[in-house]
Amino acid sequence: MKRLFPIIALCGLLFASCSTQRSAEPRRYQTLHQKATVTLQFDQRQYSMAATVQVWRNELIILSLQPMLGIEMVRAEATKDSVILIDKMNRRYTVLHYDNFQKLVTPAPSYRLIQDFVSAPQKPNIKTKTEQSFEMGNHKIAIACSFTQREYNTLKSPKRLDLKKYKQVSLREILPL
């Protein structure tokens, strides 16, 4: 019996370790809340900041950027037809419709592309990093997100900003190119 126990334990370990590997597949979710580190490279300058991403599947995506001390300074709200960029520090915003993106950015983003970017498949306990590059006129823009924490189906109704408190401006005033 003393000889048989190590053999049975070894066989048990071998069978337990021979399970099929599961690929990182997107989870079926209605809402997604995650924390991330966003790195933005604009031409030769690079910026890195904390971010919070909230996704209501096929409805709304809210990206909140907190460059320092966890204070939200910039927010982007993407819906199926447009993206609203909000500069909270200067109380101003701009609305960009996806058909206007084709004139500004190559490749032109869509709601589906943004949703896939921020809800990339994730393996448990492993940081997920997604990257995307764009060209905006003569400028090259690269965005990388390292997602560190995810919670599925925990969000209630979206908390959108009341834009009455903000002044609508052109994109060039928010992003001087």
Model-assigned labels for residue ranges:
Residues 2-9:
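Sec-dependent signal peptide recognition
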Residues 14-17:
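C-terminal motif of bacterial Sec signal peptides marking the signal peptidase cleavage site
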Residues 20-82:
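Start-of-domain marker
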Residues 30, 96-97, 106-116, 167-172:
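General structural signal for secondary-structure boundaries
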Residues 51-59, 81-84, 104-105, 113-114, ...:
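Short, low-complexity, polar/charged sequence segments that are solvent-exposed and flexible
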Residues 61-111:
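An acidic-aromatic
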Residues 89, 125-177:
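Non-transmembrane domains of secretory- and envelope-associated proteins
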Residues 108-133:
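Charged, gly/pro-rich active-site loop segments
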